[in-house]
Swiss-Prot record:
GO cellular component term, pick one: large ribosomal subunit
Pfam family, one: Ribosomal_L10
Lineage: Bacteria, Bacillati, Actinomycetota, Actinomycetes, Mycobacteriales
Protein name, UniProt field: Large ribosomal subunit protein uL10
Alphabetical list of InterPro entries matching this protein: Ribosomal_uL10, Ribosomal_uL10-like_sf, Ribosomal_uL10_bac, Ribosomal_uL10_bac_type, Ribosomal_uL10_CS_bac
Entries under PROSITE patterns matching the protein: RIBOSOMAL_L10 (PS01109)
Species in which this protein is naturally found: Mycolicibacterium vanbaalenii (strain DSM 7251 / JCM 13017 / BCRC 16820 / KCTC 9966 / NRRL B-24157 / PYR-1)
Keyword RNA-binding listed: yes
Family the entry assigns: Belongs to the universal ribosomal protein uL10 family.
Single GO MF annotation: large ribosomal subunit rRNA binding
Amino acid sequence: MAKADKATAVAEIAEKFKEATAAVVTEYRGLTVSNLAELRRSLGNSTTYTVAKNTLVKRAAVEAGVEGLDDMFAGPTAIAFINGEPVDAAKAIKKFAKDNKALIVKGGYMDGRALTVGEVERIADLESREVLLSKLAGAMKAKQSQAAALFVAPASQVARLAAALQEKKAAGDSAESAA
């Protein structure tokens, strides 16, 4: 690879690091081209799965200000640059790695820090953003319903008390008139 090509490749990878919301570093040794194509399809349009030389990726990471990933760049390395929802991409990678033992997750990068394999797996185990938001909305709605019931309860108790007093008074008046 010519020096100009290397510089271009480093710049492209650095730009991907800068634009990505997260990145997952994997080892793809033993995967076929069709396996890699299947993985790329499963990741969707918001994730780019890039195979590159470790030295170029290290330089690009330094250029992008990404730290803590150097130990992960050993052996055949590929990086999933996630531009969308990190949970969805992590789930897809975890599922693919489960089905294809040759894919090994080495770690990742998100929110300005390196992630361990365990942290990437925990992200994959999270529910999607939409599910979490709907659960939050449901919890908020339930709390509002409880609050409304709490505010209505004293008024309904007063109304029942007034009705009971009125019945008692009516019963007392009818008892006096009968006597």
